A protein has these predicted regions:
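Long, contiguous N-terminal structural blocks used for assembly/anchoring
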Residues: 1-40
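Short, mixed-charge, low-aromatic patches
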Residues: 2-8, 50-57
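Extended hydrophobic/Leu-rich segments
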Residues: 15, 19, 23, 82, ...
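Amphipathic protein-protein interaction modules
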Residues: 51-106
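Acidic, proline/glycine-rich low-complexity IDRs
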Residues: 98-120
């Protein structure tokens, strides 16, 4: 899947090669539920995912927030994006957005990440 200035974007299945199985097991695959090729994680887990992405020097191009209401996933239309070329700053923006969202809205949300495998 190409996009975002020609960088290769990571889809839900690509995360299988990047993340430990335990994090994948706790993720919520959104493909069947709402038709997007993303994985959502609760706050504590998405922070761990961000740390792994940072270690691998991958870019966080943005992300979306979904509300969990029992088994129902609700689109919140809340999101952020990053258009720079510094993977550290992309990580910082994602981390700041997610932390602020969690502090202001609580634990009934999951976060998806739009990630590129290149910092070029």
């Amino acid at each position: 899947m190409d996009g975002y200035d020609g960088k290769f974007m990571i889809t839900d299945l690509d995360f299988i090669n990047i993340l430990p199985q335990a994090l994948l097991n706790r993720g919520i695959f959104l493909r069947e539920a709402i038709g997007v090729y993303e994985i959502g994680w609760k706050f504590d887990d998405v922070i761990k995912v961000l740390d792994i992405i940072k270690e691998k020097e991958m870019m966080v191009l943005g992300g979306d927030v979904y509300e969990l209401n029992g088994d129902e996933i609700i689109i919140t239309y809340d999101s952020w994006s990053f258009s720079g070329s510094n993977f550290i700053k992309s990580f910082e923006k994602a981390s700041e957005y997610i932390n602020n969202y969690y502090e202001n809205n609580g634990d009934d949300f999951i976060y998806t990440l739009i990630v590129s495998n290149t910092t070029k």
